[in-house]
UniProtKB/Swiss-Prot annotation:
Disulfide bonds: none annotated. InterPro entries: Ald_DH/histidinol_DH, Ald_DH_C, Ald_DH_N, Aldehyde_DH, Aldehyde_DH_dom. This is Aldehyde dehydrogenase family 16 member A1. GO terms for cellular component: membrane. It comes from Homo sapiens. It comes from the Eukaryota. PANTHER family: ALDEHYDE DEHYDROGENASE-RELATED (PTHR11699). Belongs to the aldehyde dehydrogenase family. One of its GO terms (molecular function) is aldehyde dehydrogenase (NAD+) activity. Interacts with SPG21.
Amino acid sequence: MAATRAGPRAREIFTSLEYGPVPESHACALAWLDTQDRCLGHYVNGKWLKPEHRNSVPCQDPITGENLASCLQAQAEDVAAAVEAARMAFKGWSAHPGVVRAQHLTRLAEVIQKHQRLLWTLESLVTGRAVREVRDGDVQLAQQLLHYHAIQASTQEEALAGWEPMGVIGLILPPTFSFLEMMWRICPALAVGCTVVALVPPASPAPLLLAQLAGELGPFPGILNVLSGPASLVPILASQPGIRKVAFCGAPEEGRALRRSLAGECAELGLALGTESLLLLTDTADVDSAVEGVVDAAWSDRGPGGLRLLIQESVWDEAMRRLQERMGRLRSGRGLDGAVDMGARGAAACDLVQRFVREAQSQGAQVFQAGDVPSERPFYPPTLVSNLPPASPCAQVEVPWPVVVASPFRTAKEALLVANGTPRGGSASVWSERLGQALELGYGLQVGTVWINAHGLRDPSVPTGGCKESGCSWHGGPDGLYEYLRPSGTPARLSCLSKNLNYDTFGLAVPSTLPAGPEIGPSPAPPYGLFVGGRFQAPGARSSRPIRDSSGNLHGYVAEGGAKDIRGAVEAAHQAFPGWAGQSPGARAALLWALAAALERRKSTLASRLERQGAELKAAEAEVELSARRLRAWGARVQAQGHTLQVAGLRGPVLRLREPLGVLAVVCPDEWPLLAFVSLLAPALAYGNTVVMVPSAACPLLALEVCQDMATVFPAGLANVVTGDRDHLTRCLALHQDVQAMWYFGSAQGSQFVEWASAGNLKPVWASRGCPRAWDQEAEGAGPELGLRVARTKALWLPMGD
């Protein structure tokens, strides 16, 4: 009997050249689920935990809806057990030499290589992502990450001398992130000696499989623990006493809520928020290559978010035409089909993008959809949104996958204004055949990663991160290692949580100031105003506060600054920032050296002021001399603000740039009134920031003496000094939305408030939590920690090719 024809003949295939299915068997994934009796628990301390009386959620194929397994949901006691297991494992893991940790990471990479088919099949089956992206991208990069960080671990004692591991790290991942994002964060943490407790979303078997592979290697079972649970467990994990740092990935609003809930807690917080990226297409670009870049950025399964596309007006019509043609050739389908470009993200993601597109249409946007896409849910076609009014709500919110929002621009300056006008600062690519134009745009973009004529390239040796509301945590390269280290000898962060602190009233009112009697002493202080915009000026409140010496005698009066004065100081700092950041390192160094020389000329006056505050004359003179040396030291360091990385496997360098934060608010400590002020001022200015500073509340006169020299040495607005009630000024600065970062060296309650208030614009915060700092010691007063906190990293990729 003749065979039944089940498909097209070979001749017809060669005539039509149409795609056919290339299915990948998922038998190995189902077999692994069978070993768990189709019931997944948690992997803690090297073994599976399946506690009784726990709720479970189904793990389903997002396309067919088939139930693959059930996943137990963790509760608070499970979280506590996992943290305790990680804490116990940390004692042995961190004590071992880096070479031992390197060997363990290398063995884990080998195990992943042996079981890579199981890993990519399971990930594609459960998430719906295209299997070729997982197989050829994620799994291979996961192995590279382990090998790279094994090398870093083996050289830790020499390369990272002076640093020690933080402890137990809590990792929190959202449903939209793949297992690779977990690898980006656990690899550096494990390499430097930390242990990890990861909280993954319900029905996420791939991270559990990775934990099993790591736990079965042998002597270090508790270094990686994975729990599956709902979002309600996030604050429970983050507030565990044993957790030293929380690495959170998710939406900006979730990050804000976590920032507020962790204010005053012992755990540090690293945020990686949002998924949207940006692509700039100029009129000198190779349009066809740029169109492929759009496809890689928005309509592949590499990234979890959408894309904002800026196209120069002169090539708008041509670029849109070619982009729409390319969209018509995209294929969507089951993730295990090796011939599809896009898989599916599940019903929740489909609902999100449908709402976004409906709202965009209601706001006047044009929507174009194309591609070979199955009609049933949860598939959604590639979508191109254009003509969206700039002031519409959809132009401000994050773009979901698989949507591209396209907008025109006329000049490079306008492109930077539009691109930097959003609160997000994750990643971007610039497409231009003119290197000068590409570098100008790349340097001007306020993002963490920039690719030139490419998009989405990643390498373990290159740092990846963001700025603004995309968070300020990093992974990859040396920056990723420092995320999980603290300076050796410094005590672990202690909780300064005060449950009685009222955030609504803290620092709201300024205590009344009354006449304090006659000034007593050989050298009464001259009347100072606020140093704003390069000159002294009267405070808005037209009020002054008395300053007393160590004997309780009246030493002088300083201006009582308030919210209006802080607003003026921040505006002056913003006006000065572009010019100062654009100065060459040599020019900035010269001005710092000039200020150091001015301090030395004023040595006797400054020493006498310190002597009235209780310091001995020799100690006072030594503080002035050390302050001048600090200025010169940071002036010398300013010359080395970045270096070049040569990436293996790619032709071309990656520039690791150290860029200024912007306007930096600094609240100085009471102790070391001159040295602490200079030690915080010098690195901030050296790296191109402008500052608004609140000097020592006990003796602000020394900082105001320095301001007399800054008025003649520095450009106007570079450094602004506001005196007054510390709590009130702290409140004004912490709540200010145009302050890019804040350092606070004051009380425990003030530290808690600053951490809580920083959630407004998610500014990075460095708070002392009421602990004193040895400013006269090199490690604490001028160590590498200051250099890391005073600037942010930008990775600028310059790949070469045809």
